[in-house]
Amino acid sequence: MSVLLIAEHNNKELRPFTLNAATAASQIDADVHAVIIGQNCGDAAKALSELPLVKKVIHVEAPYYENFVAENFAPVIVKLAENYSHIVSSANTFGKNLMPRIAALLDTSQISD
């Protein structure tokens, strides 16, 4: 099964942590799909689609995703989760806030650094 990468960005460009997470995801499986969630983040989505390790980009946009609130992001990821063997995110404040919520909603444990 494919790996789902959660892209981190500022609605304009990808954050460098996303590149690190993409490399980690590709070590699990070569079929890496990425989800980018935000508002007016088309440029970041385009940059994500140009990463050689990413095979597919899922672009989700709405005004309530603009401020990167984990409580808004988690349900989106959970809906996508059944199609993936692993979900990968950066190991910073963004990922450490979001991933436990996703794990709880999926009734599973997470592996973190």
Each PLM stretch: what is its role?
Residues 1-113:
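N-terminal glycine-rich FAD/FM-binding segment characteristic of electron-transfer flavoproteins
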